[in-house]
Amino acid sequence: MKPASVIIMDEHPIVRMSIEVLLGKNSNIQVVLKTDDSRTAIEYLRTYPVDLVILDIELPGTDGFTLLKRIKSIQEHTRILFLSSKSEAFYAGRAIRAGANGFVSKRKDLNDIY
């Protein structure tokens, strides 16, 4: 079985690295890109199919909600998991209404992603 391809988008390099290490424990998951740059991610998505994007709400030059719309316009079946330090209740609801498949608070254990 082909591993699930994952893009990690977060403004903090340490968060990107931590998620990659955590996901790297599972041989059925392959992190194909780690970035905080929306243009880099969009270029990648235009070229390669991606199963999941782990997406922060706050990114340099854009926000996760705007980027979610762009991602879905390129790859409608790509799943989106929001990861944010924002207030869980308000932003979780907004994320799901915007089309995300899930929401994880950074204030919780990152093992919730795994």
Set out the residue ranges of the language-model regions:
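Conserved acidic segment of CheY-like receiver
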Residues: 2-15, 19-23
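Residue-level signal for the "D+5" position in two-component response regulator receiver
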Residues: 34, 59-62
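Acidic, metal-coordinating helix/loop segments flanking the phosphotransfer/catalytic sites
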Residues: 34-52
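Acidic catalytic/metal-coordinating carboxylates
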Residues: 37, 63-66
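Short amphipathic alpha-helix used as the core "switch/output" element in two-component signaling
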Residues: 43, 65-76
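Active-site residues of response regulator receiver
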Residues: 56, 84
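C-terminal output helix
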Residues: 90, 108-114
